[in-house]
Amino acid sequence: MFFHIVLERNMQLHPRYFGRNLRDNLVSKLMKDVEGTCSGRHGFVVAVTGIENIGKGLIRDGTGFVTFPVKYQCVVFRPFKGEILEAVVTMVNKMGFFAEAGPVQIFVSNHLIPDDMEFQSGDMPNYTTSDGSVKIQKDSEVRLKIIGTRVDATEIFCIGTIKDDFLGVINDPATV
């Protein structure tokens, strides 16, 4: 889920940022460039927590830009198979539903929803139990288990299930 790791990045800085605030400018550019991004290997970078080392700059020929090797600590979010997450439902259709847990989108197929829940179409599509006591619709909060992940270069997709003990709707916006 969340990990605190050390990463490295080569930062290019324009000559106008040189001077007394060089380090501050480098750190703010690093935060702007990496926070909120996703690398397939490490996951989503949530926050930069510290700078371990800023190496000596190397002037690039012809441009005046300087490349600094920066070693920094950060918190990353990476979901794994078998992990239990709480997510918010964003879309419901007859094939299943999509939910989001932070930056990760999770699809739960109708085959991975308990058998006693049926799809109800209409202006607010949902999955409802036969007695109507539990309803999964847009903005419902669900607890689910990740059963598969696919990692791209810039995004992570997950497949989840609520067909297990203690999984399912946590908070239904219709009852609030």
Swiss-Prot record:
Q: Which Pfam families match?
A: S1 (PF00575), SHS2_Rpb7-N (PF03876)
The places in or outside the cell where this protein is found are: Nucleus
Q: GO molecular-function annotation terms?
A: single-stranded DNA binding; single-stranded RNA binding; translation initiation factor binding
Keywords associated with the record: DNA-directed RNA polymerase, Nucleus, Transcription
Which CDD domains does this entry report, sorted A to Z?
RNAP_II_Rpb7_N, S1_RNAPII_Rpb7
Q: Which family does it belong to?
A: Belongs to the eukaryotic RPB7/RPC8 RNA polymerase subunit family.
The task this protein performs is described as:
DNA-dependent RNA polymerase catalyzes the transcription of DNA into RNA using the four ribonucleoside triphosphates as substrates. Component of RNA polymerase II which synthesizes mRNA precursors and many functional non-coding RNAs. Pol II is the central component of the basal RNA polymerase II transcription machinery. It is composed of mobile elements that move relative to each other. RPB7 is part of a subcomplex with RPB4 that binds to a pocket formed by RPB1, RPB2 and RPB6 at the base of the clamp element.
Name recorded for this polypeptide: DNA-directed RNA polymerase II subunit RPB7
- Give the organism the record lists: Glycine max (Soybean)
